[in-house]
Amino acid sequence: YLYIFGDNIEETLGKTKFIIFYFLTGGFAALSQAILDPNSTIPMIGASGAIAGILGAYLVLFPKAKIKVFFWFIIFFKIFKIKAFIVLGGWIFIQFLSFSHNYLNSGGVAYAAHIGGFISGVVLINLMKNKTRIKRKISRTSVPNSK
């Protein structure tokens, strides 16, 4: 996910702001996990919450970008191009479903971190978008192509 979506966000924000954005969303993701699942005894490790923040930013900045999606069922497979708001909207919906289903079972995946990272990415990029430099850069950037 970072490879597919991260480069567009980095290009829009610039390297320094991207790194700050990445660590901030990762911090909010960890905080969300700690608040929403305070009794968890499973250690939290990884970058998925920060990457979820990148996905949230991508949804805000490039909702109409087409993402290549590979569908496979037994011997049938096909590659579709689907708009980012559908792909990422579906992804966050699955995170909410998984969190609610696994809330009592504690399945070892930090779904609350994914949700918190995604939401913080949406909020932070909207705050940063209000800066004129970011606005101009977004308007000049064409809709990115999927890799």
Which residues fall in each region the model found?
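A detector for small-residue-rich transmembrane helices and their helix-helix packing motifs
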Residues: Y1-S146
